[in-house]
Amino acid sequence: MKNSQAVTSLTWWSVVVAYIVSTNSRLYIGWFGVLLFPLIAVSTVAYVAAFILAPPVDIDGIREPVSGSLLYSNNIITGAVIPSSNAIGVHFYPVWEAISNNEWLYNGGTYQFVVLHFLAAVLAWLGREYEYSFRLGMRPWIYLAFSAPVVAASAVFVVYPIGQGSFSDGMPLGISGTFNFMLVFQAEHNILMHPFHILGVSAVFGGSLFSAMHGSLVTSSLLSETASYDSLNAGYVFGQEDETYAISAAHGYFGRLLFQYGSFNNSRSLHFFLAAWPVIGIWCTAIGVSTMAFNLNGLNFNQSLLDSSGHVVNSWADVVNRADLGMEVMHERNTHNFPLDLA
């Protein structure tokens, strides 16, 4: 009897394991997926509930709560999950650390709950990509590419609040909250003049340009496999071994149009470049945010130009600095009267 139960139990577990690691399923689960799906479900439900229902949060720790939910007079644009209170700092603040659920909500415990579960889910997705690639015998470039947004999110939601000493400095989880975070970040750290941020911007915009160029070149040089009155697409099947476009013709065109040495005649080199450019740039952005988290800020050229009499000749850097002062004065206006860190 015991042997029969053991065999039944073993068979049941074998079926579960086979389903989890199967690469033939419509949706690959994987061992990391066992973590991923519950985590992303919990964080999504908590986020939606907080966005709709959460009471105001004492974000600055001065007993002046800020509302972020739809129930408290916000809309889709102004709504957000408000970061944890400055009174909590960088302490881990699960619900059992508060005296009551009302206190936990008042101090913004929902923010930590959503952010930490979401980041854990994103890391599980990263691991799932590696696991799936490994089981298919693929190299781990997809996993490596996705590491860029993972480290960027980690820099914004974890490293920056830790460096600043409080989760209240984290990015609010909403549309206007994101823009508010960006403006305050510029005011306090001059991110526009940080070399790593400049690299990140060139990567994102450059990557968009290169992708558009590549796509237009490919679709303009498809090899015709059909009669003139049939669709060009009818001559191809998914996964075919033959080339679908003439790379030499496409990049010969590009080389003559713009720059001879800016074109590729090797498909692998081309696609590696298209992947590496934005990934490396976003890595640089994450490094930049992480350094500014500890106040290693952007370059400062304020009042750097003087005339022969020693008077300041205002430059664009001084205009930006004046704007930064204005944004900093408006930020946390009830907490301080003037930004001493920029005075």
From Swiss-Prot:
Membrane-spanning parts: 28-45, 117-132, 141-155, 196-217, 273-287
Positions annotated to bind [CaMn4O5] cluster: D169, E188, H331, E332, D341, A343
Keywords, comma-separated and alphabetical: Calcium, Chlorophyll, Chloroplast, Chromophore, Electron transport, Herbicide resistance, Iron, Magnesium, Manganese, Membrane, Metal-binding, Oxidoreductase, Photosynthesis, Photosystem II, Plastid, Thylakoid, Transmembrane, Transmembrane helix, Transport
EC numbers on record: 1.10.3.9
Pfam families: Photo_RC
Domain of life: Eukaryota
Family to which the UniProt record says this protein belongs: Belongs to the reaction center PufL/M/PsbA/D family.
The protein's name in its UniProt record: Photosystem II protein D1
Origin species: Prorocentrum micans (Red tide dinoflagellate)
